[in-house]
Amino acid sequence: MIQQESRLKVADNTGAKEILCIRVLGGSSRRYAGIGDVIVATVKDAIPGGNVKRGDVVKAVVVRTVKERRRADGSYIKFDENAAVIIKNDNDPRGTRIFGPVGRELREKKFMKIVSLAPEVL
């Protein structure tokens, strides 16, 4: 469960290391974001020479959450960290690599490029 002021690890090679959620997209009173939801965030920590720099406002899709999520078959999925992938306005990733596993919910929400780049889909 990601909300405003939540900090997330960045799971791609755009150069950002950590982002801070400033808005959950999808309605004026929407409070939480889960796996597959889009957020607006600001870059809090970045490596020199990367595609994004500290202070940039970016859109990102959540790929891992610590809070467990119930699936339709009754199983639950949760991860060790909160992580996101920075995306462009057309929902394609800005980076060329994805690090770590991503949730199957991304396939259902039509983030196919992220699913194809990910090393593992859980």
Curated annotation (Swiss-Prot):
Gene3D superfamilies: Ribosomal protein L14. GO terms for biological process: translation. The keyword Transport does not apply. One of its GO terms (molecular function) is large ribosomal subunit rRNA binding. PROSITE patterns: RIBOSOMAL_L14 (PS00049). Binds to 23S rRNA. Forms part of two intersubunit bridges in the 70S ribosome. This is Large ribosomal subunit protein uL14.
